Amino acid sequence: MTDNSQVKVIVGMSGGVDSSVSAYLLQQQGYLVEGLFMKNWEEDDTDQYCAAAQDLEDAQSVCDKLGIPLHTINFAAEYWDNVFEHFLAEYKAGRTPNPDIMCNKEIKFKAFLEFAAEDLGADYIATGHYVRRREVDGHVQLLRGLDNNKDQSYFLYAIGEKQIAKSLFPVGELEKPEVRRIAEQQDLITHNKKDSTGICFIGERKFTDFLQEYLPAQPGDIVTPTGEVIGQHQGLMYHTLGQRKGLGIGGLQNSNENPWYVVGKDMDNNRLLVAQGADHPALFSYGLIAKQCDWVDRTPKKSTFRCTVKTRYRQQDIPCTVTPLDDDTLKVIFDTAQAAVTPGQSAVFYNDEVCLGGAIIEEHLQK
């Protein structure tokens, strides 16, 4: 058996069950384990402040139970500069970004990794992400988590193999119910804590209220494919492709009963484009153009290849053909047309269980 007693691992403790069990499992494997709680957002709201304080308290309780120290660090400035500013700029441009992906790339596997190595003397960091890693021929691959329902490789595609080589993912080999069972067996306070939802810095607040604090909304027309104005939107940034609820345009005269869907944004004229029916052609794309490629092996792709792609989290894999247009731009053609391919979101590529990397969707291709 490997002697890990001199191998120091700093676990990112969020105050949730996954990171709690990660710390416990690493301890069982003989590692020298310490915890680190990251504060990435300066709360300005009482409910948010209370939630963050509760998370820290829960992380401390778990570390006390395991008999390990808990360090704390404030990355709010780095988060604002590298994640939040980008998030706002994308919304302003009419796209729908994914801040969790940026947070993993810039904070958890960059700022945290550097701090753990340089200031705390870590050999590895660990997180509660549902992914796995595998070493093959001197390379480190990122693999989907074993629990299909919880696999988080979609959110980690932008991390390079150097970072993955320095990271451990203990719960990636387990299914979620097993993780909760271990936490309960070990009497960890987080065993029945519900999974956090929503974007880390918004918490449980209403998204529209949050955005309005930072970006002034500009109301405009809601328009059909024939150019008919059928309503008013409160701001393009509040809407995303494929959205059906919250449009406020039900029960129109001369229209059938089919629901309306957002099919596009006309940024120049501040108009929201909608069409009726889940099978309306305007909702579907045969492919996409993506930029800002991040390959796990950090090697730009030079020739056309086959793989599968996800254009959003929890989506079924779509077989596709990928053609690099240059080192930072890809053209992706799906085997079957896909609904609601959304600029700003990420296209993430897979070869079976291996996550190859991904890129940001720039535009969807329509016939």
UniProtKB/Swiss-Prot annotation:
GO molecular function annotation: ATP binding; tRNA binding; tRNA-uridine 2-sulfurtransferase activity
Subcellular location, record wording: Cytoplasm
Cleaved signal peptide residues: none
Keywords attached to this entry: ATP-binding, Cytoplasm, Disulfide bond, Nucleotide-binding, RNA-binding, Transferase, tRNA processing, tRNA-binding
Gene3D superfamilies given in the database record: Adenine nucleotide alpha hydrolases-like domains (2.30.30.280), HUPs (3.40.50.620), Translation factors (2.40.30.10)
Top-level enzyme category: transferase
Catalytic activity: S-sulfanyl-L-cysteinyl-[protein] + uridine(34) in tRNA + AH2 + ATP = 2-thiouridine(34) in tRNA + L-cysteinyl-[protein] + A + AMP + diphosphate + H(+)
Region (Interaction with target base in tRNA): 98-100
EC number: 2.8.1.13
Site (Interaction with tRNA): H129, Q345
GO cellular component: cytoplasm
Ligand binding (ATP): G12, M13, S14, G15, G16, V17, D18, S19, M38, G128
Function summary: Catalyzes the 2-thiolation of uridine at the wobble position (U34) of tRNA, leading to the formation of s(2)U34.
Name of the molecule in the record: tRNA-specific 2-thiouridylase MnmA
Organism: Psychromonas ingrahamii (strain DSM 17664 / CCUG 51855 / 37)
